[in-house]
């Protein structure tokens, strides 16, 4: 996960310059060639990964087919809480990443600065991922998610005010939010592993792959909803590309960088209050599940 966020830093800072270089003034061609370049690198890395991975399978009573696995997962209440959590995260909480270009282009009038802004945010997120290791050793994952999402909401809400106070203030608010997001992301993935263990404990059958796939689906579903929400809001409030925006649209853009994702963070914190798998409960489950060492 740490390396993936380092890649985010490089992509955030390098994409627009690469578009300009490859497109030679043609933005559409530049983006097409840039993402083709990224795709080629991704394909090569996947090949290297598959070549180097050796599966270590722990013998256990697995479900005989995916539908049976899905049936077991569907009866697990923690899964549905995590499913809703993931949708909130990928619909609202990651909205600042997609709204940043609009914020810099129309609200600040400094479109060229967005690459550095995002790169610094993701660099802060890398620091948060590293710090997460210290936090997870001392605190229950559920409590970390509650506290981190409350802090994330406060940091994002502060951006609404900081946006009008100058670069040091809005950059500090964004970097603080991204640092906290670096704590949230790996904690969420650790909880997905807990759900897989819970499903095995509850059903007596392993369904780890299907559990992870189902949660990953919620991520993609949330991303698609997030894109839809952004488009619908822009349409409702009268956004017109490449023109001077109305005051209403400018407030919407600033809210997409701050208030709306903050609401998502508070929603996640609320869901975590009813999430039943704390670290103490998971210790009991791992001792009792069929493949316990």
Feature roles, as predicted:
Residues 1, 111-112, 199-218:
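Loop-to-transmembrane helix entry/capping segments in MFS-fold secondary transporters
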Residues 1-101, 105-110, 261-293:
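Intracellular loop-helix junctions on the cytosolic face of multi-pass helical membrane proteins
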Residues 1-17, 122, 214-234:
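Glycine-rich segments within core transmembrane alpha-helices of 12-TM secondary carriers
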């Amino acid at each position: 996960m740490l390396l993936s966020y380092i890649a985010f830093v490089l992509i955030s800072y390098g994409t627009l310059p690469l578009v300009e270089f490859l497109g030679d003034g043609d933005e559409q061609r530049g983006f097409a060639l840039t993402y083709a370049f990224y795709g080629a690198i991704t394909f090569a890395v996947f090949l290297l990964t598959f070549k180097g991975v050796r599966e270590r399978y722990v013998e256990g009573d697995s479900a005989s087919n995916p539908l049976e696995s899905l049936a077991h997962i569907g009866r697990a209440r923690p899964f549905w809480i995590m499913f809703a959590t993931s949708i909130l995260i990928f619909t609202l909480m990651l909205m600042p990443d997609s709204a940043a270009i609009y914020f810099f282009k129309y609200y600040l009038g400094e479109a060229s600065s967005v690459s550095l802004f995002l790169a610094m945010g993701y660099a802060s997120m890398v620091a948060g991922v590293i710090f997460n290791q210290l936090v997870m050793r001392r605190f229950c994952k559920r409590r970390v998610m509650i506290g981190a999402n409350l802090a994330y909401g406060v940091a994002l809400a502060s951006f609404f005010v900081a946006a009008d106070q100058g670069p040091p203030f809005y950059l500090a608010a964004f970097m603080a939010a991204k640092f906290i997001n670096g704590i949230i992301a790996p904690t969420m993935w650790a909880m997905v592993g807990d759900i897989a263990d819970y499903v095995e404990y509850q059903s007596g059958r392993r369904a780890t792959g299907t559990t992870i796939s189902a949660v990953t689906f919620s991520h993609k579903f949330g991303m698609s909803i997030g894109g839809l929400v952004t488009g619908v809001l822009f349409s409702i409030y009268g956004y017109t590309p490449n023109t001077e925006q109305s005051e209403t649209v400018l407030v919407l853009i600033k809210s997409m960088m701050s208030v709306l994702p903050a609401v998502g963070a508070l929603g996640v914190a609320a869901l975590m209050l009813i999430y039943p798998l704390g670290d103490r409960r998971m210790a009991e489950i791992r001792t009792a599940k069929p493949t316990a060492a």
